């Protein structure tokens, strides 16, 4: 596991083996889920087991969870090596790929951003609690240090 504060819950499906992969980027996404209450990050594993998608990590209000069994030798399917229909891909499309990027999913909430429980929202209308954002920042710092990832190589939500 990447850090003692991270829960290790490895996936056995929807991951690919790549021995000694080079990690250059950090991508942060959101789950578009119903809430960020404690335990939701761990529950996200079941979603990834059913879909042809995955992420290296997921965070909620309490937990940071690692789904990638071995960051040095496996990659998850989160960054979008293929363009979605009607999409031009992101700014780093074709540069930051599943093979060279670590992905973090932040559990989002449907609570309106005007609620006192939520202080962050994104352009798609999903909201994030301070606790979930703080866990994403904490995990990002751990990963950036461990893999020498410059802040210019980190995506935004």
Regions found by a protein language model. Give the residues of each.
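Active-site-adjacent loop/helix surface patches within enzyme catalytic domains
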Residues: 1-150
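Short, glycine/acidic-rich hinge or "gate" loops at secondary-structure transitions
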Residues: 149-157
């Amino acid at each position: 596991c990447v850090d003692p504060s991270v829960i290790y819950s490895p996936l056995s499906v929807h991951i690919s083996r790549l021995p000694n992969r080079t990690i250059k980027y950090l991508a942060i996404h959101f789950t578009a889920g119903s809430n960020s209450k404690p335990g939701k990050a761990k529950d996200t594993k079941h979603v990834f087991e059913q879909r042809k998608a995955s992420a290296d990590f997921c965070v909620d209000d309490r937990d940071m969870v690692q789904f990638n069994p071995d960051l040095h030798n496996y990659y998850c399917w989160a960054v979008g090596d293929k363009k979605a229909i009607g999409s031009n891909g992101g700014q780093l499309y074709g540069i930051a790929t599943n093979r060279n990027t670590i992905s973090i999913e932040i559990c989002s909430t449907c609570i309106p951003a005007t609620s006192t429980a939520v202080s962050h929202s994104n352009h798609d209308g999903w909201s994030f609690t301070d606790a979930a954002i703080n866990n994403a920042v904490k995990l990002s710092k751990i990963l950036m240090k461990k893999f020498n990832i410059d802040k210019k190589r980190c995506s935004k939500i």
